[in-house]
């Protein structure tokens, strides 16, 4: 793996907070789309002994009142009812986005409250000055709307985390590096100039959620405070980092954020079943380092990532980046060791698919964004 000359959190004496408890991991393991992913991620972090270099904080479960800081009472009450009954055929469920990619399985409300509470706990650690970086790898469910589940997301923990951080920090920057557009977070803050959302994502006809073109810039007082970077298939580390750094450099100057929420969905990584981008953890790690050098209060979230072993590889590598640690290439022996065959290494090799992002189109998008950011005051 790439060498780190100095810790990414150099100058920050406080260790990162790592949101974890066995109970929390067990609840997150139950999500049907990513079964046991939370355990795989934590076990690999533990196998590299990274947990010993972080402050482990047990998450609280979100209260109904905390969840209602964004979601409607009607949606939360319906989610709770179908969760208790395990009723996936309730006639009102379609209205609330439940079914198909968000099935109303038994216990889903408890899962949503656990994830929401974990991200709120992480945000509170930053508010309390307990750390400069707080990590909730099982968070980052960025598609949920205030009254609707969407795209495997039942509760928008990212929005709840931002709302909690707003109690202390005046201007919050949300950066979303998931394969999919962070539409739920953008929608939540599309009318405000206090939260800027930046999303790099695949934008292609028929690809979920279908929003996030470069011309989508926010509304009303929030006009120009939504930044969307549409990307085509097969992008690799070097070009992705060039785009990310170019955008974030301009965003930082224009917006002057006081805290950052960073969603690091691993469905961009080569080998993901989404079969779209062609990234490795090293490329995402460079983007992460760029943000960490601002030395702002930073809340780190997971998100997508459907090749479970590669997602664990990615988030473990990124945890190492946060700690300024170079990790051994060889996967240590641990509970899920056999999932990392046939090579049993931390590195992920990109495929040979050609990058479909034409340099002149990329430059057009960057110029458009730079022009829009001139309106940010």
Swiss-Prot record:
Post-translational events: Phosphorylated by PKA on serine 39. Phosphorylation reduces deacetylase activity observed preferentially on histones H3 and H4.
Molecular function per GO = histone deacetylase activity; histone deacetylase activity, hydrolytic mechanism; histone decrotonylase activity; metal ion binding
Q: What is the native source organism of this protein?
A: Bos taurus (Bovine)
Q: Which InterPro entries match?
A: HDAC_PDAC (IPR050284), His_deacetylse (IPR000286), His_deacetylse_1 (IPR003084), His_deacetylse_dom (IPR023801), His_deacetylse_dom_sf (IPR037138), Ureohydrolase_dom_sf (IPR023696)
The family annotation for this protein states: Belongs to the histone deacetylase family. HD type 1 subfamily.
Annotated cofactor note: Binds 1 divalent metal cation per subunit.
Query: Where does this polypeptide localize?
Result: Nucleus; Chromosome; Cytoplasm
Q: Which sites bind substrate?
A: 101, 151, 306
Please verify whether the record's keywords include Protein transport: no
> Which is one Pfam family of this protein?
Hist_deacetyl
Q: Which UniProt keywords apply?
A: Chromatin regulator, Chromosome, Cytoplasm, Hydrolase, Metal-binding, Nucleus, Phosphoprotein, Repressor, Transcription, Transcription regulation
- Its Enzyme Commission number(s) read 3.5.1.98, 3.5.1.-
User: Catalytic activity annotated for this protein?
Assistant: N(6)-acetyl-L-lysyl-[histone] + H2O = L-lysyl-[histone] + acetate; N(6)-acetyl-L-lysyl-[protein] + H2O = L-lysyl-[protein] + acetate; N(6)-(2E)-butenoyl-L-lysyl-[protein] + H2O = (2E)-2-butenoate + L-lysyl-[protein]
> GO CC annotations?
chromosome; cytoplasm; nucleus
Cite the binding residues for a divalent metal cation.
178, 180, 267
Summary of the function given for this chain in its UniProt record: Histone deacetylase that catalyzes the deacetylation of lysine residues on the N-terminal part of the core histones (H2A, H2B, H3 and H4). Histone deacetylation gives a tag for epigenetic repression and plays an important role in transcriptional regulation, cell cycle progression and developmental events. Histone deacetylases act via the formation of large multiprotein complexes. Also involved in the deacetylation of cohesin complex protein SMC3 regulating release of cohesin complexes from chromatin. May play a role in smooth muscle cell contractility.
Q: Indicate whether Nuclease appears among the record's keywords.
A: no
Subunit structure, as described in the record: Interacts with CBFA2T3. Interacts with phosphorylated SMG5/EST1B; this interaction protects SMG5 from ubiquitin-mediated degradation. Associates with alpha-SMA (smooth muscle alpha-actin).
Task: Name the lineage.
Answer: Eukaryota, Metazoa, Chordata, Craniata, Vertebrata
Q: What is this protein called?
A: Histone deacetylase 8
Q: What class of enzyme is it?
A: hydrolase
Q: Disulphide bridges in this chain?
A: none
- Activity regulation note: Its activity is inhibited by trichostatin A (TSA) and butyrate, 2 well known histone deacetylase inhibitors.
Instruction: Enumerate the cofactors the protein uses.
Output: a divalent metal cation
